[in-house]
Amino acid sequence: MLIEIPNVFSKQEVSHLREQLDARRWIDGNQTSGAMATTRKRNQQLDKDDPVAVALGQQIMDRLLAHPQFVSAALPLQFYPPLFNRYQGGETFGYHIDNAIRSTPDGMIRTDLSATLFLSEPESYQGGELVIQDTYGQQSIKLSAGSLVLYPSSSLHQVTPVLSGERTAAFMWLQSMVRDEGQRRLLFQLDQSIQTLTAQQAAEQELFNLTGIYHNLLRRWSEL
């Protein structure tokens, strides 16, 4: 399941984020690469321990945990703290699959979902599409600044070469309360239907029944 979430951050907020990011020292992006990815990856990143990157990453996590659509789709249990990368001058990241397990200060997490928060407007750079191969075929993603795409970490994906301009983004992984992608999709669809029916002031008893089904399925499928 691939979900695009628009306007997680406003244009003004993105501008403020970029001012802080652009002033930092960027390093070789292979810091977070697995052994197979190092030959395919050419980009720049902020060091994961950079204090500004850590603070902005926390700001992003706080925003996402307060975003109803993100929480509904991801059912987040634990984040790998957001990192920041940029591509320019032909830099690219060829097709790869993200590592299944990552280490955090609090222990190990299973990477169920990956997310990219775009911090450059699409017209400001040429190339740089996030191309994802999923069960519905190939999808090419290039969102407006402040918007986010969420997709299974098991997906084969790449960032195409940035031929001009600069593509800056935040990226992150998370472990979901529900490991199985199909189960997460069903829960998301059910929750979205409940929210739609609630807005339409549907019959209270039917909403009560559907909400009960949702929580009983979540209880059955979740791993905490």
UniProtKB/Swiss-Prot annotation:
Disulfide topology: none
Cofactor: binding details: Binds 1 Fe(2+) ion per subunit.
Listed GO biological process terms: DNA damage response; intracellular iron ion homeostasis
Binding site for 2-oxoglutarate: 167
Protein name: PKHD-type hydroxylase Shew185_0721
Record lineage: Bacteria, Pseudomonadati, Pseudomonadota, Gammaproteobacteria, Alteromonadales
SUPFAM superfamilies recorded: Clavaminate synthase-like
Pfam families, A to Z: 2OG-FeII_Oxy_3, PKHD_C
GO MF term set: 2-oxoglutarate-dependent dioxygenase activity; iron ion binding; L-ascorbic acid binding
Binding site for Fe cation: 96, 98, 157
Annotated keywords: Dioxygenase, Iron, Metal-binding, Oxidoreductase, Vitamin C
Residues of the signal peptide: none
Keyword Iron applies: yes
Class of enzymatic activity (EC top level): oxidoreductase
Family annotation (InterPro entries): Oxoglu/Fe-dep_dioxygenase_dom (IPR005123), PKHD_C (IPR041097), PKHD_hydroxylase (IPR023550), Pro_4_hyd_alph (IPR006620), Pro_4_hyd_alph_FE2OG_OXY (IPR044862)
Membrane-crossing segments per the record: none
All copies of domain Fe2OG dioxygenase, residue ranges: 78-176
Record flagged with keyword Oxidoreductase: yes
Database matches in SMART domains: P4Hc
Cofactor(s) of this protein: Fe(2+); L-ascorbate
Record EC number: 1.14.11.-
Domain of life: Bacteria
